[in-house]
Each structure stands twice: as structure tokens, then as C-alpha cells.
Amino acid sequence: MARKRVLVADDLAPVLDTVSSLLSQSFDVVDMVSDGRAALEATLKLEPDLVVLDISMPLMSGIEVAEELQRQGNKAKVVFLTVHEDHDILKTCRAAGGLGYVIKVLMDTDLVSAMNEALAGHMFTSRFPSEEQTP
């Protein structure tokens, strides 16, 4: 089976490097970009199976990118990678077509799972570390 093609968008180079390392064993990373406009253009041009989007990026937010992809009928699955532990933002991401919502501090354990779930058409949401109960 062919490896799934993934585009990654985040404005922080260290995050792009980490994501690339996490995905290199299982996915074909077709491009890594650092702003929302580049993410939109690259997704429309390269037609990846899945797009990993940071929410807070220059030029266009990840949410705006996802909304535009949805408007244009693009079939790429969307997973958001974010620092935001916020249920309202999560709802906005879902409305924009996002199937995955991964908190950056959990990307080592959650990102690949979220991507696989999204590719299968299922939703995945990281637990919010700030809501964890302490004994």
C-alpha cells in the first residue's frame, strides 16, 4: 500500500523538524510550510491526503486554511496541531472540517494516531493536559 502524502504547516521551524521526524517512518511528507497562505497554495497544488495545520500562523490561520479548503471541495483530511487547550477553538476547528485536534505537548504520542484516525474518517482529540486530575 502506498504511503499517505502529508503536508505540514507551522510557523515554528523546530515544530516542523519534530513533526517531520515523527512522520518520516509512516508517511510521505510532500511539503513543510510556515504560513497559512503557503499551506493553502501547496495543498491545492500538491493534493496531499492529509494536512497538519497549526492554528496560529502568519497570513492565514490554520482555521481559515481549513475553511477555504472545505469551500473549494478539497478532499484532504485536516488535523490541527496547536497549543490551544480550548473547547471553543476545538468546536471551531471541527466546524472548519478538522478531524484531528492535537495539543503540541502531546504530539509525540498523539499526532500519528490522530492522522491515522483522520485518514479513516474518524475524529481524534488530545486530552487537555490542563484538565488532568492530580492525585
How would you describe each model-predicted region?
Residues A9-D10, V33, V51:
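Conserved sequence signature across two-component system core domains
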Residues D35-A38, S61-E64:
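Acidic catalytic/metal-coordinating carboxylates
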